[in-house]
Amino acid sequence: MSTVERYRLVDEWANGVELYDVPSVSCLIDCGRRVPALRTAVRCGDHILTYAELYERLDGGVTGPAGPTLDDLARLLCAIAAAAEIGAVLAELGPEGAGLKPVAVAAAADDRRAVAADQPSCPIDRAYGSADVRLLATRWDTTDAAVELLAALADGATLVLSTATQRTDPAALAELIAVSAPTHVVADADTLAALAFVTAPALPTVRRWDVFGNDCPAALSALLRDLSPGSCTGFAYTAPEYAGVAARGPLDGSGRVRPIPGARLLVLDEDMNLVAPGQSGRVYLGGAALALELDGATEGFVDDPFVPDSRLVRTDAFGGWTADGWLVLEVIESASVAGIPTATPVSVLDVDGYAAA
């Protein structure tokens, strides 16, 4: 392996651009204080919390119950704010035996804001924030929910959180999207793929679909664009050990991604050696939003062999680099198994760029 190739695999391709001027948790929260008090901050089922009610809880006030999900989500937001003040690690977030620093959650929220701003529903008012409605189909007690809520508050948007029934019943999910009229929808591939098996109404308000996880079915993009003409789609690679998204790419079935700012992705063999472009290996993840080990020996965490005093986590994903710097994840076919017609599954060796590697 040449010196240039090695540099690309360890540094140029492996690292997202350096993080710059990431707002703190308190700064993100304070942005929401200028939003009209009666605007809905978060909704789940028949329950809502307005900006006034949510910020009253953040300030230590007492408000009436808003349902178990929103009450718990508000408590989680308060815990994040409190941890940020003293620099504590959030054991509530992250995998077992690890936790997240508030700055990691803030960095993930800042990335989410940048993605949402790429497809605004209307010009953003500097005083009153955004009129976006962002729908998230996941549990309240996940890092994704915390990140999405922080990003929505900072932008003055409304977050709609799906119920357990809506996540598992595609007809209920389609109805939720139609009724809540979101501008952005964030969910895993299986949840959105199920929309193919119901008579879904037109969903013209959705401007962007973000599919997270490690499943990138080719047919899903066409399905979502048919439901929302003029919308765009994106694939976001995530792992439990990393706050928010680690890498992004097109939702085209190839599984190709590049690390987001602050993230680090390496492809290594069983002996922790670099895998050359055109070959497949295990994906290791590190960077600014990596979870911290609470007991010093959490399973899957290893030293970065190329950066002193840095840690990586061994993910469940496999993939390889193309000759032009895309990381191609080996595509998981769970959405295909669910029944969506797809093209032939993609192998990392079939993607343009490997032949030239």
Walk through the language-model features, giving the residues of each.
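AMP-binding/adenylate-forming domain of the ANL superfamily
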Residues: S2-E85, V89-Q119, P217-S221, P261-R264
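Conserved AMP-binding/adenylation subdomain of ANL enzymes
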Residues: D111-R112, A116-R134, T142-T183
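Flexible acidic/glycine-rich loop/turn elements at helix↔coil and beta-strand↔loop transitions
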Residues: D30-L38, G129, V275-A276, G320-G325
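ATP-dependent adenylate-forming carboxylate-activation enzymes
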Residues: H47, A88-L100, D141, A157-I177, ...
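Conserved coil-to-alpha-helix start sites within the AMP-binding
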Residues: L70-A84, G97, T138-D155, R167, ...
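Generic structural signal for small/hydrophobic residues in well-ordered secondary structure
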Residues: G32, A66, W140, A145, ...
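Gly/Ser/Thr-rich phosphate-binding loop
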Residues: L149, A154-A157, H184-V186, A196-S254, ...
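AMP-dependent adenylate-forming
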Residues: R6-W13, A98-A108, C232-F235, L251-A357
